[in-house]
Each structure stands twice: as C-alpha cells, then as structure tokens.
C-alpha cells in the first residue's frame, strides 16, 4: 500500500480529516473512535467526502456500539449525518484493491 497525504484525528471531540492518494489499499483503517461515549456526549456528526476511484472499491463505514457496521458511502461525493450513540463509536474506511484519492472531513 502506498499512502501520500495527510490525516488528523481528535478522538475527544470525534473529529477527523483524511486527504490522501492511495494505491493498493486493502483492509480497514479507523479514522476516529471513541470507545466510551457518554449519553450526554451523543450528538450528530456530519461527514463530508469526495472519493475518486481509479481501481477497486472503498467504503466509508460507521461501527456502532453493538458492533453493527453501516456503509455510509461507496463512491462519488456528498455528505452524510450520523447520530453517535452511548458506548463505542468508530468511523473508518475499508478498501478492496483500492487506488485513488480520498478526502473526508468528520465534524
């Protein structure tokens, strides 16, 4: 895998940025996580994304406290809102032989 770009992550505030050109991405990469979110910290986050694929597949996923995986997007660009829940919350990407550019902002 080749990764060229930048990424930031702030688990305390559940924010992240990912701006990279990748080649041969296989597997999963967690962008931001909070393993013990309290009920009063649960809020809606907005994820903006742009995905330009040269080859393979890439998905943005949300993993909820009950470890249910939800695909938020697989291609193109746009934004999606996610309601965080008490417990463990994860936002990540999964790739299958993915090559292309990925831009993601979680706020």
Show the residue positions of the predicted features.
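Transition segment at domain starts
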Residues: 1-36
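Extracytosolic and intramembrane catalytic regions of membrane-associated proteins
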Residues: 59-61, 83, 94
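A short tyrosine-centered beta-strand micro-motif
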Residues: 89-91
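Edge beta-strands of jelly-roll/beta-sandwich modules across compartments, strongly enriched
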Residues: 58, 95-107
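A short beta-strand element within beta-rich, extracytoplasmic domains
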Residues: 43-53, 93
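Short, solvent-exposed loop/turn segments in extracellular or other extracytoplasmic domains
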Residues: 73-79
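Short, surface-exposed beta-strand/strand-loop-strand elements in extracellular ectodomains
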Residues: 54-72, 104
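Extracellular and analogous surface-interaction loops
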Residues: 31-45, 81-86
């Amino acid at each position: 895998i080749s990764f060229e770009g930048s990424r930031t992550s702030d688990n305390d505030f559940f924010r992240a940025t990912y701006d990279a050109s990748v080649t041969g991405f296989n597997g999963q990469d967690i962008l931001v996580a909070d393993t013990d979110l309290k009920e009063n910290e649960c809020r809606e986050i907005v994820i903006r994304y742009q995905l330009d694929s040269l080859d393979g597949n890439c998905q943005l996923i949300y993993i909820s406290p009950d470890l249910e995986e939800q695909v938020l997007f697989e291609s193109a660009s746009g934004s999606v809102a996610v309601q965080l829940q008490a417990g463990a919350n994860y936002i990540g990407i999964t790739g299958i032989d993915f090559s292309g550019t990925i831009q993601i902002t979680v706020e």
